[in-house]
């Protein structure tokens, strides 16, 4: 017998690496007490202090208090950027008045939002993150939301010819 050619196992949802690996995308997220949020693709694999710096550079004021989980990358990021860090270790949700419930809620809403689309390509993930932030955390009037969304789409790279689709950058980053 000769076997029929078939797709590779990974394309059918098989063989993959467990845990944090280069198959997962690192998306650092931040939400402040006013409801402003920042999230953007940093890299593939486990998050690092350089990846955090890439996303949050210039967006967090000096001497700000950051509340995060026990990941060691936040410690290096806080030391390099003159920030105060409170880490909530695993199994706990708060330390005194500081908690990670706000960011956990953000992650839950983001997952629900992305589940609607049955998987999003990494190439377009930043655009979906912006869309989610405008819908969920844009604490502004509808007219302002529309102008923010219009500005984000107008500044995106748009190609008219179908031939140029393959020449687009793999991860469009909207600022």
Q: Where are the model-predicted features located?
A:
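Residue-level recognition of single "structural anchor" positions
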Residues: 1-175
